[in-house]
């Protein structure tokens, strides 16, 4: 079967990742010790995508947990899911990266990377037909960002033809953890542009907004935010894990979603999201959840989709839904909002469907969009980056670990290029004939 090996790096990556395994185990009827306690054959039909069957009918996640300090690992190990993971798959250092990208990428992380790759190799050898890798990490810190991108490039070297999907938590202006986030994020995006096949961008600010405005929570915790992320991760991977009518895998998703290789940064959304007390007052219908899924208030990336245009998008429906209704809904949405879609990619909305809804819901939809509006997020990071880099603020922390200023300049210009590319395709219309020409020239330059 088409297996996926899951990696989680750094504090954020491990917390989001652990939440993801919680949701996954619940959906597949696996208890905290890896025993199957489910009731439906569908739960086991494609369970080996994410789980390895060990002796005594135990199911073990194909997960590798990485961090440069033991703290998060210890809490995972002593938490409810501690008995689920394979003990050898916890790989951690002692020193921490101190939110320093250079430590994660060049010094501390580089020392640990070989032992992580050994574990990854073991997991990959356990697969019949490895489909690819997925990694959860944040881009603002040291381990998830620095060591995460180091792992991605090493895996890329060793498995060049396998898919690489990343769930990346971007730093956001209102929810800032450290002052050097713009540096770490710019250096990370510089790596992701080259080495990832699909990056699902998630940011804390958007998650907070959903918690406050939609879910009506007064004091959302990181647990609430991680729960939202895990809903999306579970939705994105539904088609890979359950038998369904229209199945999709990481590669099909990329083929449908990535019109140009560098533009693989997606925004994600999930619907229905309702405040706890008000669920019983509304019937969830296909038009309603489709409407909510496309609403920019529901996006887990803080940018306004109405200001950009969709190059492509995908909607994964779960539950007993009629495909005809779904197709009609998607058609009517596209016609109503035709200006939000580029006209030079016909049929740029893909739908897939799976019969099994998430726990507690009759139906749900996960939305994935490749929109030019995502440049807002990159612009925000680029502005903060250049404000600090102009004055060379905090740079000594990075040069002290052996980095060169040149690398910062390169990362900055790569980010600016990415923003310009998104803008170029946003402005392009079907009548511009030279866009294809420009693109081909760019390709040739890259290959030289």
Swiss-Prot record:
Cellular component aspect of the GO annotation: cytoplasm; microtubule
PROSITE patterns registered for this protein in UniProt: TUBULIN (PS00227), TUBULIN_B_AUTOREG (PS00228)
Gene Ontology biological process terms in this record: microtubule cytoskeleton organization; mitotic cell cycle
Annotated compartments: Cytoplasm, Cytoskeleton
One GO molecular-function entry: GTP binding
Residues the record lists as binding Mg(2+): 69
InterPro entries according to UniProt: Beta-tubulin_BS (IPR013838), Beta_tubulin (IPR002453), Tub_FtsZ_C (IPR008280), Tubulin (IPR000217), Tubulin/FtsZ-like_C (IPR037103), Tubulin/FtsZ_2-layer-sand-dom (IPR018316), Tubulin/FtsZ_GTPase_sf (IPR036525), Tubulin_C (IPR023123)
Highest taxon of the lineage: Eukaryota
Keywords in alphabetical order: Cytoplasm, Cytoskeleton, GTP-binding, Magnesium, Metal-binding, Microtubule, Nucleotide-binding
Cofactor(s) the protein needs: Mg(2+)
Amino acids binding GTP: 11, 69, 138, 142-144, 204, 226
SMART domains, per the entry: Tubulin (SM00864), Tubulin_C (SM00865)
Family that this chain belongs to: Belongs to the tubulin family.
Subunit-level organization: Dimer of alpha and beta chains. A typical microtubule is a hollow water-filled tube with an outer diameter of 25 nm and an inner diameter of 15 nM. Alpha-beta heterodimers associate head-to-tail to form protofilaments running lengthwise along the microtubule wall with the beta-tubulin subunit facing the microtubule plus end conferring a structural polarity. Microtubules usually have 13 protofilaments but different protofilament numbers can be found in some organisms and specialized cells.
Main function: Tubulin is the major constituent of microtubules, a cylinder consisting of laterally associated linear protofilaments composed of alpha- and beta-tubulin heterodimers. Microtubules grow by the addition of GTP-tubulin dimers to the microtubule end, where a stabilizing cap forms. Below the cap, tubulin dimers are in GDP-bound state, owing to GTPase activity of alpha-tubulin.
Official protein name in the record: Tubulin beta chain
């Amino acid at each position: 079967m088409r297996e996926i090996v899951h990696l989680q790096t750094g504090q954020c990556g491990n917390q989001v990742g652990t939440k993801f395994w919680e949701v996954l185990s619940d959906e597949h009827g696996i208890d905290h010790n890896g025993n199957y306690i489910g009731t439906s054959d569908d739960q086991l039909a494609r369970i080996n995508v994410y789980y390895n069957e060990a002796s005594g009918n135990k199911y073990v996640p194909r997960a590798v947990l990485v961090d440069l300090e033991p703290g998060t690992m210890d809490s995972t190990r002593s938490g409810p899911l501690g008995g689920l993971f394979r003990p050898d798959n916890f790989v951690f250092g002692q020193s921490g990266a101190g939110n320093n990208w250079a430590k994660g990428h060049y010094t501390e992380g580089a020392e640990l990377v070989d032992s992580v790759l050994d574990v990854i190799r073991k997991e990959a050898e356990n697969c019949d037909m490895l489909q690819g890798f997925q990694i959860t990490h944040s881009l603002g810190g040291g381990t998830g960002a620095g060591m995460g991108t180091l792992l991605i490039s090493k895996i890329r070297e060793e498995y060049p033809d396998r898919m690489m999907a990343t769930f990346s938590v971007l730093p956001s202006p209102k929810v800032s953890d450290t002052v050097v986030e713009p540096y770490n994020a710019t250096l990370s995006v510089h790596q992701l542009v080259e080495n990832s096949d699909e990056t699902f961008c998630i940011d804390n600010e958007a998650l907070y907004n959903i918690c406050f405005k939609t879910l009506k929570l007064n004091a959302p915790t990181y647990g609430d935010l991680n729960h939202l992320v895990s809903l999306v991760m579970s939705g994105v991977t539904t088609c890979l894990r359950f038998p369904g009518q229209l199945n999709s895998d990481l590669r099909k998703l990329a083929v449908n979603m990535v019109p140009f290789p560098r533009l693989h940064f997606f925004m994600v959304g999930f619907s229905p999201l309702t405040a706890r007390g008000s669920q019983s007052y509304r019937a969830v219908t296909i038009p309603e959840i489709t409407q909510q899924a496309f609403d920019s208030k529901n996006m887990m990336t803080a940018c306004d989709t109405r200001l950009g245009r969709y190059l492509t998008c995908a909607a994964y429906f779960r539950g007993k839904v009629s495909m005809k209704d779904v197709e009609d809904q998607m058609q009517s949405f596209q016609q109503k909002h035709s200006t939000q879609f580029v006209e030079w990619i016909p049929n740029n909305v893909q739908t897939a469907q799976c019969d099994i809804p998430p726990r507690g819901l009759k139906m749900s939809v996960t939305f994935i969009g490749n929109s030019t509006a995502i440049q807002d997020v990159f612009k925000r990071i680029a502005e903060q980056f250049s404000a600090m880099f102009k004055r060379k603020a905090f740079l000594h922390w990075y040069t002290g670990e052996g980095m060169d200023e040149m690398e910062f300049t390169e990362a900055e210009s790569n980010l600016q290029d990415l923003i310009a590319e998104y803008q170029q395709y946003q402005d392009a219309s079907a009548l511009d004939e030279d866009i294809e020409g420009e693109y081909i020239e760019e390709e040739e330059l890259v290959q030289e």
